[in-house]
Amino acid sequence: MNEFPVVLVINCGSSSIKFSVLDASDCEVLMSGIADGINSENAFLSVNGGEPAPLAHHSYEGALKAIAFELEKRNLNDSVALIGHRIAHGGSIFTESAIITDEVIDNIRRVSPLAPLHNYANLSGIESAQQLFPGVTQVAVFDTSFHQTMAPEAYLYGLPWKYYEELGVRRYGFHGTSHRYVSQRAHSLLNLAEDDSGLVVAHLGNGASICAVRNGQSVDTSMGMTPLEGLMMGTRSGDVDFGAMSWVASQTNQSLGDLERVVNKESGLLGISGLSSDLRVLEKAWHEGHERAQLAIKTFVHRIARHIAGHAASLRRLDGIIFTGGIGENSSLIRRLVMEHLAVLGLEIDTEMNNRSNSCGERIVSSENARVICAVIPTNEEKMIALDAIHLGKVNAPAEFA
C-alpha cells in the first residue's frame, strides 16, 4: 500500500477528458484539469485552471499520457492507488459500481450502443489507463446504476413489449452519481434516517434531471432511455409530443437525424430565447426585460416545478427538496421562482439564505414555517466516484461516507 495513496478520477466525454486527483484519506482535491478537443487539431490540456497547452497527440491515449506526465511532475504518479472511471451508461446490467475486469469491460461494450458517443470514449479511457498504470485497481462508476432500483412501472414506456424485450427500450435515467451523493448529504443535513426518508433532488445544469429518492433509493427520475427526456434544458427540448415532431418532419422534410439534432442541440433555453443556452446570459436579459429570455426562464421553471411535484408522488412522504448542479447551486432566481411555483406543497422561501453565495455551501433556503424543507447541496461527482473506488479497493474511506 502506498504511504500517501491518491485516487485518480477520469471522466472521458465525447471529445474531452476531465480528471481529478484526490487524497484517499479525506478526498481533498490535490489536482484537476481537462483535456479538450480530443481527436481534433485543437486538442489542449489545462491543469488546475491554468493556461491551455496544445497536446502533441490528439487521441484519448495521447491525452491520458499527457495527464500522467503532469502527475509525474508533481510526484503523484507512484501514489496512484486507485482509478475511478465515470461510465455514462451501464444499461440494466450494472446496478452498482464495479472493479474493472475483462468481463466488466465486455459488458460495458455490450451496452455501449445505448450511449455510443460516451461509452466508447469511456472504454478508451479504461484501456489507456490500464497501460499507463499497470496493476492499479480501476473501478467503473455508472451514471445509470443508482436508478436501477426503479420498479418496472417507473421505467417502462407504453410501447409494444417486444421493443423492451428485444431492444432494451426503457427508461434508465442519468446523473445517478450526483443524485446519490446529494441524497446522502441531504440525510445528514436534514437529520433524516436513510431508511425512512423521502427526497426530491433537482440536478439543474445545462443538462438537468429530477430524482425521487425513497429510503435512500431512486424510485423515479425524469431522464429516460437517453438524457433528452424530462426537463427542458440548455439546448435539449425535454418532454415533447412525438406527434409534434412527426408533423414537423412532414412539413419541413427533415430527416430523423435532423430532428434529433434539433431536439438535442437547438432547443430548450436556446430554442425559446433565441439568445443563449447559458442561464447566466438569460438572467441578465431577464432583468433587462428581454421577453423571450423571460419566457424561456418561465418555461424552464414551470417544467422543473411540474416534475418535482410529480416525482413527489413516488414517495410515501416528502421530507425535502434539494437543489444541486450549476444552476441549482448558483441561481437564486431559479430557486425562488421554482419555490413560488410550488406553494401548493407548502414551500416558503427564506430570502436571505436563498440569496447567499454558493460559497456558503450546504444550507437550508426555506423558511422555518415551510411545510417542506428546501436546501442547496453542492454536488461532488468526483468525490462520489473516488469514494466508490476507495470502498471497492479496500482503502480506508473518509468517516462521513464510511
UniProtKB/Swiss-Prot annotation:
Record InterPro entries: Ac/propionate_kinase, Aliphatic_acid_kin_short-chain, Aliphatic_acid_kinase_CS, ATPase_NBD, Propionate_kinase
Enzyme Commission number, as recorded: 2.7.2.15
Pathway assignment: Amino-acid degradation; L-threonine degradation via propanoate pathway; propanoate from L-threonine: step 4/4
Active site: 143
Stored CDD domains: ASKHA_NBD_AcK_PK (cd24010)
Binding-site residues for ATP, renumbered to this chain: 11, 18, 175, 203-207, 278-280, 326-330
GO molecular function: acetate kinase activity; ATP binding; metal ion binding; propionate kinase activity
Cofactor(s) needed: Mg(2+)
GO CC, any one term: cytosol
Pfam family, any one: Acetate_kinase
Entry similarity comment: Belongs to the acetokinase family. TdcD subfamily.
Protein role: Catalyzes the conversion of propionyl phosphate and ADP to propionate and ATP. It can also use acetyl phosphate as phosphate group acceptor.
Protein's recorded name: Propionate kinase
Species per Swiss-Prot/TrEMBL record: Escherichia coli (strain K12)
